[in-house]
């Protein structure tokens, strides 16, 4: 029997809803960024970034793998992850979403893999794609710097989305 990988990319609004729907929260270091730091390649993004909810949070806390946080702290962590341009990846479980990893394209294994091999749909799914309003784009290139999978390029001083590479993270 096939075991499906139901990892999904979640926009900020959906992660906010997941947080609102839960009452137990835990946060742990991003294992990908932690490994990179140990190997001497420290990432400048948020380290304590992976959240678990409900019984998964209980398990992580009880086993010393994460610390308990409040709902308000979970909301603040999401805001910080968003400010850092991190991609909100959820694991899917028949009981609901139990984990959110806030991933960077430079150190997180799944995002680095899909970027290196140009395979965005292989590992990550989303129902969204980035969009650019050509009339309001100022050509500041902030979006190209924030895109964790390098799916935004500048064309004639206007941001252009490479839809084959976009994973719809926001």
Pin down the residues of each PLM region.
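Ferredoxin-like iron-sulfur electron-transfer modules
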Residues: 89-95, 117-146, 150-168
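Iron-sulfur-associated redox domains of electron-transfer enzymes in respiratory
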Residues: 1-112
